[in-house]
Swiss-Prot record:
It holds the Pfam family SdrD_B. Specifically interacts with bone sialoprotein (BSP), a glycoprotein of bone and dentin extracellular matrix. Could contribute to staphylococcal osteomyelitis and arthritis. The keyword Signal applies. Residues 109-126 have a biased composition (Low complexity). It comes from Staphylococcus aureus. GO terms for cellular component: extracellular region. Residues 1116-1149 form a propeptide. Changing I207T: In strain: 80s-2 and BM12987 / O24. This is Bone sialoprotein-binding protein.
Length: 1149
């Protein structure tokens, strides 16, 4: 930091940690213009980085008339190009851009007004008074003559005074070339020139004020010249003898404190391994360097600060790497090409990691040193400064900035703003330092001339070493450049359709027209001055100036260069607009007289860790006490960063590089199996124990008294007994034995299993080598046992249950017992019987059913047993525990489940599946009953005639109706008819009558029909079929229908001697087949309708629609007269046909 009052710089001597030179380019504006600060850059030690800032200042200069008798003083501004500065190891470089414009007017000077034109800063205007015109385009008017031998008038102005300058137009001819600096050109000076209130663009390279300059005593002894440089005043000493104006302290360059910690490339001796996954970011943020308002003033040198706190895992080894990523719109340096990061170090200066920067990816790759092998639990901090990359951001815009440490990202939204030109009438200009080459000692300035493309008359641009205020006044500021015939000046014209980037930085000049040879350039316009005569212009131009500078001691920089645009306004007066750029690089020192600050002394702390066998907290009181190796000791610095070491074989540890007056914390990790001993056991600080954590402040000396002691933690036992509690009272009785092989589990207070064992032959168990604390003991219930009641008596005689808590407090615990008793077994079962009366109750006369399968399932549905009933219908399952079960009875073939739950539980039927719960008792109430369905016998004979029909029976399967046996009687009637058929056959049919007798059998005779039916006695019904015949009647209708067909044949039935056919009709009904019957008419009944009945089957399908027909008279003699039988048969057949056809028609519909 520059001492602004004495203009002297001092250096600090000693170790420098993570210091970077910073170069700021700034433009200061006092009045209407804003302060524009360029870039603050921080690089590795010895590397100089520039920070560009644009500063514009507007000043209202008051000028009063002065008498012609005023002394005329010609001042030539000279620059000491080899200024001497204090020896600064790490200079801070600041660049300041100052713009000014002023119009000279006649004698009575009015206060200049500030105007804004096209969103630009305006300056004051005064009438010209004997001031020489600079390179104005030739005119016929004598007042517009040009004087190329300009002699600058720079006056030192006292603070708080207004300076008035009176000038008169010169009537003499202007020389075409400048004379020596001492020549006068009619410049009258009535008062000191006003001190500009505007400050140049200044770039400040800020370094931590506490960091000393890296100059050793030996270096000073061996190099006296360096010592002389350190105590020698800056070139300000020379300047103090010159009548030049100095910038007021109010416009001095701003200093931006921007720390950055990064490092130089690591030698590739160790294999690289990216360990981003082992880096834990604990805190990171992005902040703005000047004002936290969401706006980055890029030309103000406002930097972006990225801070990151992170932990380095102990698994990280030397040679491993991590990455830090910049946002792609930012860059570490704004005006230099040196992007070398500095080391990441701890507060004592030890290097943790070194880094390299990749410009293409905007990424730093850090490689860890053996620091991570020597220390543990390393916490690090990273603070990076960056600036808007004008190549990526040529114009104002909104950005979302994203930075990342070890791929962990953080973001911030900002708006980027750039400077505006300084404007006075048609004069409008702006400039920046766009590049700094610290090797060649060159600086590049980019100037926008007439960026607003106004109609500017008699345009001249002057480039000057030193400062130019916004109003065009010249002043000596904070630095200088060398402008001579070797200075590179290029001029480019901007086409009407081209737009200048707002960043004021050109990366490709080839896109613009090179008009250098079309303008008049005078590089010797004055001492360290050049002038460009543009004439009348209405286009924008770019001027590129590359000038030399003289570095100070230790490469300090004080580079300042201003520009002024002069035009003739509509009143034929000159209007001025000025702009200044400055780079300052100085060391952060506290000011002073230039003497060397004593080297900062660093201190150490540490000492000893021992095993305190006698636990008294004092070292050496027991011969068995010894040092403890490998104990982890952690040092916490004032900024919160940490590092850890382990004690050596002698129990010793040490931390060095500590600063006086700062406070540190030391923590000792308690080794496994030990406890901290008593603290401060004696008044002797060298012999006591300081405990697990101690805070110490360095007071000008080392502190090697930070000791601590530990003693071995005693171990204890836990356990006792598992026994069979035969009387189930929960108390251990003398005659009750222990239970062997019971599993016991021990858990710590967090629930973690720390041991498992089993009881011995006596039921005893134990766990050993336990520390004080709370434990949980869990007993596993042995097979065939049940836990007894718990907590019934004294702790050492009761049962603690299946789970209990045991506490160890400086003693064994032998009270954790558990008791069990043998679990009783139970039985389940009972009886399956034949419920002959179907009432669902077990009667004394009803017998059991043998060989019924019974299955037992547990609560999960798993089969745990299967058995069959014995000859008495009894069954049972034994050896069952209390619980839920399901009993499943398999229904015997041919039997039907009887009604359930009709009476008392031990006498009723429980159904095919029964859920049962056993609770401490047997259950013999699980019974079930079945009965057999009624079946008709087959007198199969009876019909056997009608057997022929029987087929029809098969129709008659609907016989199953037959159950309505009784109907079947009516069938029998039909039989009787059929008998009549049987007539043809044989009276034996009439037997069938006897069938009819059997009718009671429900004629299952008709069974006889379809014996196939036979099972279906209901078949027998087939008579009932015959019912169904009665159905059949209706069927028979249908039959008869069918008959009817056949009947028409059937008539031939009549042939068929036997009505039986017609009867058989009833069979025949059994189906329209009967057609065929009729065919078969051949009475032989043999139509035994069996034939007919084949077709009958479809009819049987519809038979149940007619099973309500009237029954035929039960059997009778055939003496109704066979003579009439034929006639009636025919009639019935015809009627049946009609009905059948009608019915079919209906069905078809």
């Amino acid at each position: 930091m520059i001492n602004r009052d004495n203009k002297k710089a001092i250096t600090k001597k000693g170790m420098i940690s993570n210091r970077l030179n910073k170069f700021s380019i700034r433009k200061y504006t006092v009045g209407t213009a804003s302060i524009l600060v360029g870039t603050t850059l921080i690089f590795g030690l010895g590397n100089q980085e520039a920070k560009a800032a644009e500063n514009t200042s507007t000043e209202n200069a008051k000028q009063d008339e002065a008498s012609a008798s005023d002394n005329k003083e010609v001042v030539s501004e000279t620059e000491n190009n080899s200024t001497q500065k204090n020896d600064l190891t790490n200079p801070i470089k600041k660049e300041t851009n100052t713009d000014s414009h002023q119009e000279a007017k006649e004698a009575p000077t009015t206060s200049s007004t500030q105007q804004q034109q096209n969103n630009a800063t305006t300056s004051t205007e005064t009438k010209p008074q004997n001031i020489e015109k600079e390179n104005v385009k030739p005119s016929t008017d004598k007042t517009a003559t040009e004087d190329t031998s300009v002699i600058l008038e720079e006056k030192k102005a006292p603070n708080n005074t207004n300076n008035d300058v009176t000038t008169k137009p010169s009537t003499s001819e202007i020389q075409t070339t400048p004379t020596t600096p001492q020549e006068s050109t009619n410049i009258e000076n009535s008062q000191p020139q006003p001190t500009p209130s505007k400050v140049d663009n200044q770039v400040t390279d800020a370094i931590n004020p506490k960091e000393p300059v890296n100059v050793s005593k030996e270096e000073l002894k061996n190099n006296p010249e360096k010592l002389k440089e350190l105590v020698r005043n800056d070139s300000n000493t020379d300047r103090s003898t010159k009548p030049v104006a100095t910038a007021p302290t109010s416009v001095a360059p701003k200093r931006v404190n921007a720390k950055i910690r990064f490092a130089v490339a690591q030698p590739a001796a160790v294999a690289s391994n990216n360990v981003n996954d082992l880096i834990t970011v604990t805190k990171q943020m992005i902040t703005e360097g000047i004002k936290d308002d969401g706006v980055i003033q890029a030309h103000d040198g406002e930097h972006i600060i990225y801070t990151s706190d992170f932990k380095i895992d102990n698994a990280v080894k030397a040679g491993d790497t991590m990455t830090v990523k910049y946002d792609k719109h930012t860059i570490p340096s704004d005006i230099t090409d040196d992007f070398t990061p500095v080391d990441i170090t701890d507060p004592s200066g030890e290097v943790i990691a070194k880094g390299t920067f990749d410009l293409n990816t905007k990424t730093i790759t850090y490689k860890f040193t053996d620091y991570v092998d020597r220390y543990e639990n390393v916490n690090a901090k990273l603070e990076l400064n960056s600036y808007i990359d004008k190549k990526e951001v040529p114009n104002e815009t909104n950005l979302n900035l994203t930075f990342a440490t070890a791929d962990k990202e953080t973001s911030k939204n900002v708006k980027v703003e750039y400077q505006k030109p300084i404007v006075k009438d048609e004069s409008n200009i702006q400039s920046i330092f766009s590049h700094l080459d610290t090797t060649k000692h060159e600086v590049e300035q980019t100037i926008y001339v007439n960026p607003l493309k106004l109609n500017a008359k008699n345009t001249n641009v002057t480039i000057k070493s030193g400062g130019v205020a916004d109003n065009g006044d010249y002043y000596t500021g904070d630095g200088s450049t060398i402008i001579d015939s070797n200075t590179e000046i290029k001029v480019y014209k901007v086409a009407s359709g081209q737009q200048l980037p707002q960043s004021n930085k050109i990366y490709d000049y080839s896109q613009y027209e090179d008009v250098t040879n079309s303008v008049t350039i005078n590089k010797n316009y004055g001492t360290n001055m050049a002038n460009i005569n543009f004439g009348d212009i209405d286009s924008a131009y770019i001027v590129k100036v590359v000038s030399k500078y003289t570095p100070g001691a230790e490469d300090d920089l004080a580079v300042q260069q201003g520009v002024r645009m002069t035009t003739t306004n509509k009143y034929n007066y000159s209007s001025y607009a000025g702009y200044t750029n400055t780079i300052l690089s100085t060391t952060d020192s506290g000011g002073g007289d230039g003497t060397v600050k004593p080297e900062e002394k660093l201190y150490k702390i540490g000492d000893y860790v021992w095993e305190d066998v006698d636990k008294d907290g004092v070292q050496g009181t027991d011969s068995k006490e010894k040092p403890m190796a490998n104990v982890l000791v952690t040092l916490t610095y004032p900024d919160g960063t940490t590092k850890s070491v382990r004690t050596d074989a002698n129990g010793h540890y040490e931390f060095g590089g500590l600063k006086d007056g700062e406070t540190y914390t030391v923590k000792f990790e308690t080794p496994a199996g030990y406890l901290p001993t008593k603290e401060n056991g004696t008044t002797d600080g060298e012999k006591d124990s300081n405990g697990s954590s101690v805070t110490v402040k360095i007071n000008g000396k080392d502190d090697m008294s930070l000791d601590t002691g530990f003693y071995k933690e005693p171990k204890y036992n836990l356990g006792d007994y598992v026994w069979e509690d035969t009387n189930k009272d929960g108390i251990q009785d003398a005659n009750e034995p222990g239970i062997k092989d019971v599993k016991v589990t021990l858990k710590d207070s967090t629930g973690k299993v720390i041991g498992t064992t089993t009881t011995d032959a006596s039921g005893k168990y134990k766990f050993t080598d336990l520390d004080n604390g709370n434990y949980t003991v869990e007993f596993e219930t042995p097979a065939g046992y049940t836990p007894t009641v718990k907590n019934t008596t004294a702790e050492d005689k009761d049962s603690n249950g299946l789970t209990t808590t045991g506490v160890i407090k400086d003693a064994d615990n032998w009270t954790l017992d558990s008791g069990f008793y043998k679990t009783p077994k139970y039985s389940l079962g009972d009886y399956v019987w034949y419920d002959s009366n179907k009432d669902g109750k077990q009667d004394s006369t009803e017998k059991g059913i043998k060989d019924v399968t019974v299955t037992l399932q547990n609560e999960k549905g798993e089969v745990i047993g299967t058995t069959k009933t014995d000859e008495n219908g009894k069954y049972r399952f034994d050896n069952l525990d209390s619980g839920k079960y399901k009993v499943i009875f398999e229904k015997p073939a041919g039997l039907t489940q009887t009604g359930t739950n009709t009476t008392e539980d031990d006498k009723d039927a429980d159904g095919g599946e029964v859920d049962v719960t056993i609770t401490d008792h047997d259950d013999f109430t699980l019974d079930n009953g079945y009965f057999e369905e009624d079946t008709s016998d087959s007198d199969s004979d009876s019909d056997s005639d009608s057997d022929s029909d029987s087929d029809s029976d098969s129709d008659s399967d609907s016989d199953s109706d037959s159950d309505s046996d009784s109907d079947s009687d009516s069938d029998s009637d039909s039989d009787s008819d059929s008998d009549s058929d049987s007539d043809s056959d044989s009276d034996s049919d009439s037997d069938s009558d006897s069938d009819s007798d059997s009718d009671s059998d429900s004629d299952s005779d008709s069974d006889s029909d379809s014996d196939s039916d036979s099972d279906s006695d209901s078949d027998s019904d087939s008579d009932s079929d015959s019912d169904s015949d009665s159905d059949s009647d209706s069927d028979s209708d249908s039959d008869s229908d069918s008959d009817s067909d056949s009947d028409s044949d059937s008539d031939s039935d009549s042939d068929s001697d036997s009505d039986s056919d017609s009867d058989s009709d009833s069979d025949s009904d059994s189906d329209s087949d009967s057609d065929s019957d009729s065919d078969s008419d051949s009475d032989s009944d043999s139509d035994s309708d069996a034939g007919k009945h084949t077709p009958v089957k479809p009819m049987s399908a519809t038979k149940d629609h007619h099973n309500k027909a009237k029954a035929l008279p039960e059997t009778g003699s055939e003496n109704n007269g066979s003579n009439n039988a034929t006639l009636f048969g025919g009639l019935f057949a015809a009627l049946g046909s009609l009905l059948l056809f009608g019915r079919r028609k209906k069905q078809n519909k």
